[in-house]
Amino acid sequence: APPVLVLLFHGAHAALHAIAGAQRRLQRCCGQAAHGQPGFAAAVLLQSKLVRFKPLLRTALFAPVVTTLVAVALIWRYLLHTRYGLVNAGLGWLGIDPVDWLGDPRWAMPAIVLLAVWKNFGANMIIFIAALQAIPDELYEAARLDGARRWALFRHITLPMLGPTLLMVSVLTLAGYFQLFAEPYVMTQGGPLQSTVSVLYLMYEEGFRWWNLGQASAIAFLLFVLMVATTQVLLRLGRRGEAAASA
């Protein structure tokens, strides 16, 4: 057979094998991306007039973003230790049995997702705060003169004005979770029972641990196509939302 056909056959076989192995990881990443919006709630709360010490709270919530990920992951690994971790110590004070956070397949990935959310949501919070501060106060004042309440202000002014920002943060958050690597690499090495193997970690193992370069390349290409397709879907949904709001 011609060399080109041989290469295409092997590439297709590697891609199908990689897709079969990465399907669960892709679904998990899509589920994790839904946890990337707590920064919006924090930004709205910090913009409220009821909150005091706003600069201090902003600094405290943004601090995890600028810390070294490896150091933070190591600290979290000790915090979640089964016997000596502070988390299980707190559960013990409440009369709850200790949980093997990083050794139980049911809890390992939620623990890593919690770390990722805590580490990164401060960046989204700053973006949302900047977008909230850019909304003209005249819009709120005019709505209050018409008798609008807080929920109406939030629904008809804040959310429509934050539409492009919400879209951008959704795309960035999804891309970030698809690239989840350092957290499982430092905390669990993909275990237990490969329950914390992300798509990027699977690509790393196939390419640099087992030297299955064909499968690693197929996973990388699959990840690229999936991210482009998902971004296009989000952009189309954003354009539809803007069209509906302006209609």
Give short role names for the model-derived ranges.
Residues A1-A247:
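A structural signal for multi-pass alpha-helical bundles of membrane permease subunits
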